[in-house]
Amino acid sequence: MEQQPLQPQQGELNWRLSAHPITLLFFLGFRIGALLMYLFGVLFIKNFVLVFIITLLILSADFYYLKNIAGRRLVGLRWWNEVNTSSGDSTWVFESSDPTTRTITATDKRFFWLSLYVTPALWIGLAILAIIRLSSVIWLSLVAIALALTITNTVAFSRCDRFSQASTFANSALSGGVMSNLAGGLLGRLFK
């Protein structure tokens, strides 16, 4: 008797299960590409300045792509920063897609959040190694830039997710409360 090969289940780390595979592959490509260029760029490109610039460009592309494209398409979240020109105050604005109109796959969610939290942890590890080695302060500056960009996105998307969950809960409670009051009022009038 032949056994059927197991079909991948939603939520597994398999890019083919993604609702947006191209978005996911670019997202992971930028995240992994910056780390690989930092770690192995000097082996293939002998010019340190070129490795620094390429790594910085990949980090910038990762920051932009995650903030403006991948977050919105993979998990339905987006954030930006607004500055009040008169007072100079800075506020973060969070946006989430309507959960009733958009379904987010478990695979996309898992890839997104895992990558979002693992990448800064890897950069922190590389920062510790750069401090221990003390071989070049310039490498530490590149890691500091990478940490600033990845941690900013991590904190912003974490807050955006909390905001999204709170607003979803508030909307469901509000709509449930309004409907129960409306139904109670109608039933009360019928049986008076």
Swiss-Prot record:
It comes from Aspergillus niger (strain ATCC MYA-4892 / CBS 513.88 / FGSC A1513). Golgi membrane protein involved in vesicular trafficking. It holds the Pfam family DUF846. This is Golgi apparatus membrane protein tvp23. It is a multi-pass membrane protein. GO terms for biological process: protein secretion; vesicle-mediated transport. Glycans are attached at residue 84. It is found in: Golgi apparatus membrane. GO terms for cellular component: Golgi membrane. It comes from the Eukaryota. Keywords: Glycoprotein, Golgi apparatus, Membrane, Transmembrane, Transmembrane helix. The gene is tvp23. InterPro entries: TVP23-like. The chain crosses the membrane at residues 17-37, 39-59, 112-132, 137-157. The keyword Glycoprotein applies. Its main location: Golgi. Belongs to the TVP23 family.
